Every structure is written in structure tokens, then in C-alpha cells.
Amino acid sequence: MRALLQRVSAASVTVDNAVIGEIGPGLLVFVCAMRGDSEAEATQLVQKIARLRIFRDDAGKMNRSVSDTSGAVLVVSQFTLGADTRSGTRPGFSKAAAPDEGMRLYHCFCAKMRETGLTVQTGEFGADMKVSLVNDGPVTLWLDTDDRRNTSAGSG
């Protein structure tokens, strides 16, 4: 499972000219389920995101998590994070999960994020969405559960 996180002062997502999700300070999380992913990857990614220390403490160091700051999370599905751009000029998306499985894992991810106690807003899976944000920092991070799986396998 892949996620692109942005620390934001504010973010919103609009579908058909209506705002369906909106947060103040916190994280905007674009998420994509990959072929072969399961609920285990969703759980792993949620746990990492909820505890990732990318918010400033009183000394100005990135030492606090979104949970520590009582921040909110806006989760937006984005299958294009699964793009393969290694050859040619047109991205391929065969590594992203099939739409039905992608939707199931997206909803699983959102439910698990809510279980952390954080305030969670969401986009609409598969919809044409307009996302607005004020990036704070800027701080933008890429997470991929496959990276952790490969690292763990090699550290044995």
C-alpha cells in the first residue's frame, strides 16, 4: 500500500462542487492499494502515519505526531500512486489493486485510521475530486509498505 502524506494547515476535497471532506491542521493522505495488498498493509500504514513525528514541538523540532497535536486527517484515494513510469511516456497502472479490491482496502484504511481516535475526513473512492490544501513546511513524505517488507526480508 502506498501513501503520499502532506502536513497541512488546512485541506479539503470537493466532489460535484460540494465540499465532502475538510480539515484544519493535520495530514492530507493520498492512498493507493497495490495488487497483493491486504488489511495487514492497511493496518501497518495507519500505525506508521498516526505515529510519524513530523509536527514541530516547542523547540521547533519535528518531534510530535498528528496524534500528539490533536490534528485531523483527510484521506483521499489516488490510484495513480500505483503508476509504473519505467518505460515509455504513458504510465501503466497494472500494479494498482483492481477497483473493487482497491475500494475495499481504502475503506479498511479509513476505518482503521478512525480507530486511532483521530478526526478523519475522506474523499470519495473513484470520484473525480478537487483537492485543495495549504502545505505546512512544506513537509511531504512517501510511504510504501512494500519498502518495509523488502527491508525486513533483507535484515534477517
From Swiss-Prot:
Disulfide bonds: none annotated. The keyword Acetylation does not apply. InterPro entries: Daa-tRNA_deacyls_DTD, DTD-like_sf. Its EC number is 3.1.1.96. Keywords: Cytoplasm, Hydrolase, RNA-binding, tRNA-binding. GO terms for biological process: D-amino acid catabolic process. A Gly-cisPro motif from one monomer fits into the active site of the other monomer to allow specific chiral rejection of L-amino acids. Its main location: cytoplasm. GO terms for molecular function: D-tyrosyl-tRNA(Tyr) deacylase activity; Gly-tRNA(Ala) deacylase activity; Ser(Gly)-tRNA(Ala) hydrolase activity; tRNA binding. Belongs to the DTD family. A motif (Gly-cisPro motif, important for rejection of L-amino acids) lies at residues 137-138. It comes from Ruegeria sp. (strain TM1040). One of its GO terms (cellular component) is cytoplasm. It is an enzyme of class 3 (hydrolase). Homodimer. It catalyses: glycyl-tRNA(Ala) + H2O = tRNA(Ala) + glycine + H(+); a D-aminoacyl-tRNA + H2O = a tRNA + a D-alpha-amino acid + H(+). This is D-aminoacyl-tRNA deacylase.
